[in-house]
């Protein structure tokens, strides 16, 4: 009995999830500012740096979650769910940073409508991820569990929208772009942006699993 009392219990996992999700939303907003003001080199650099800052701050939280997971005996949800969720969330910011860096590395000259649409859908997915994560501490309450599932379904729909935009963008790119180098640049960026919404869907699926097992 005394041994059980001495073991670390629960931990502040939900608080750390919320902090990380806040950086996801922050990074997504910075990314939108980046593509909206891409023509201005100073603003482009500023907003790219903001994406990088959000990614580094989130990395520290991911490390703290994994550290806490190793020292906590009793966790609020399954240990594998905690590990899978924080790493999937971290992947979202990694992809946001990858996309912003690729634009600079490939010397993309301007943003087209397809990039703007894919960026917008990715950012909306990130915002919904933040909301879904914020509901986790109270998913034992039926109304909160229902709201979490609904939010995850919204993420799924946004990801489907991103898939459609991606297919249309790729079709147009291969029909209309004659410069092979430009085609390769844009294809890479389209794929990176669509991967963000894919990873948000992965997070949504993990959250749905947590809700179904714990509500």
Where in this protein do the model-derived segments appear?
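Cytosolic, long alpha-helical scaffolding segments
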Residues: 1-215
């Amino acid at each position: 009995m005394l041994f059980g009392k001495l073991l670390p219990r629960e931990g502040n996992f939900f608080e750390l999830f919320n902090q990380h999700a806040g950086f996801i939303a922050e990074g997504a907003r910075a990314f939108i500012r980046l593509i909206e003001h891409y023509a201005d080199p100073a603003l482009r650099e500023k907003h790219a740096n903001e994406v990088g800052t959000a990614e580094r701050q989130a990395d520290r939280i991911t490390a703290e979650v994994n550290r806490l997971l190793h020292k906590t005996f009793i966790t609020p949800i399954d240990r594998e769910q905690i590990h899978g969720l924080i790493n999937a969330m971290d992947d979202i910011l990694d992809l946001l940073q990858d996309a912003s860096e690729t634009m600079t590395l490939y010397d993309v000259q301007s943003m087209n409508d397809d990039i703007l649409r894919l960026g917008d859908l990715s950012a909306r997915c990130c915002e919904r991820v933040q909301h879904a994560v914020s509901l986790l501490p109270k998913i034992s309450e039926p109304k909160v569990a229902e709201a979490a599932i609904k939010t995850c379904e919204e993420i799924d729909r946004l990801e489907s929208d991103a898939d459609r935009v991606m297919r249309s963008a790729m079709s147009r790119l291969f029909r209309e772009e004659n410069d092979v180098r430009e085609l390769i640049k844009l294809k890479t960026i389209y794929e990176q942006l669509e991967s963000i919404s894919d990873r948000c869907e992965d997070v949504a699926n993990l959250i749905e699993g947590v809700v179904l097992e714990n509500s």
